[in-house]
Amino acid sequence: MLKILKSKIYFLLILTSIASCAKNPVSGMPDFVTITEQQEVEMGRAYHKEILKNSKVLNNKELTKYYVELGEKIAKSSHRPDLNWKFTIIDDPTFNAFATPGGYVYFYRGLLAHFNSEAELAGVLSHEIAHITARHAVRGMSTAQVTNLLIGLAASSVPGGSISNSGFNLLNQIVNKGYSRKYESEADDIAKEYLGRNGYNQNAMANFLKTMKSADDLENEIAKKEGSPISAGYHNIFSTHPSTENRIEAMNRTESIAGKKNKDAFLKMIDGLPYGTSDEEGYMRYNTFYHPFFAIKFSIPKGWDLKN
């Protein structure tokens, strides 16, 4: 038991020494991370494979090309231009986007319909890129790893006590639960900087959050009437309402460059994009439901509501 305890303490000291040598790519200040950039990239690549296994990628070459080129342009102007950046649109009506370590950024189709201009899309791309450049997921995982190790040290002194958690599970928790208010605020500031570097209107991110708040309020009203679960919104930002207003106010307090918006070009690009569930997942015509993939159809009785 004592030998195991000593080995864990020794491992904790090694982790601490590694963390003290790391510098944050954005701030240049010492960073508490226990994961190297190579490990970060490998983790992102592995997670990307799992996402592709469990998600459907949008089949729209023109829109995907536009989105990827915009993402790559912003990424090349970021604090980590040399990462092998990868931008993916998931064919899902969810209002969300997320980023994983190593340069992987994902947007859901459902989110694209809520942008009013290319500048707003660039703002959210910049925000997700900022989470990667500032190593937010890596920092969160590093803190959790050391915390788990400390708990493990305590568990070692208790007969039968044990604890285990993989980096993959930690990353999954961060992606699903979202980031802390501190990290979201930091990503907002960095995103505003990236918008300026690329000549976009720096109020775009704040304008998008206002739109999403309105959309989320409507979704929640509908959910209440139907007795459905309340939406957490983009990045879970609406799970605690006041923080959203604070983020918008913080972005509006700092000086902004009134750069380009490219509204017309963006709206033309998303024209015809399915809203909500796509026809491939089933659709209604009058009182009949059709599902192309399963090659089935059936009638819905009057007065019934269909949930696909």
Protein language model features and the residues they cover:
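Short glycine/proline- and charge-enriched loop/turn segments
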Residues: 168-172, 226-232
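Metalloprotease/metallohydrolase-associated module, dominated by Zn2+-dependent proteases
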Residues: 40, 160-204
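Bacterial N-terminal signal peptides that target proteins for export
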Residues: 1-11
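A short glycine-threonine-serine/GTX helix/turn-capping micro-motif
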Residues: 34-35, 177-181, 234-242
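Peri-catalytic and regulatory segments of divalent metal-dependent proteins
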Residues: 22-152, 190-206, 214-229, 237, ...
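Membrane-embedded and juxtamembrane structural elements of multi-pass membrane proteins
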Residues: 133-180
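Secretory pathway targeting signatures of secreted, lumenal, and periplasmic proteins
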Residues: 297-308
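C-terminal motif of bacterial Sec signal peptides marking the signal peptidase cleavage site
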Residues: 17-20
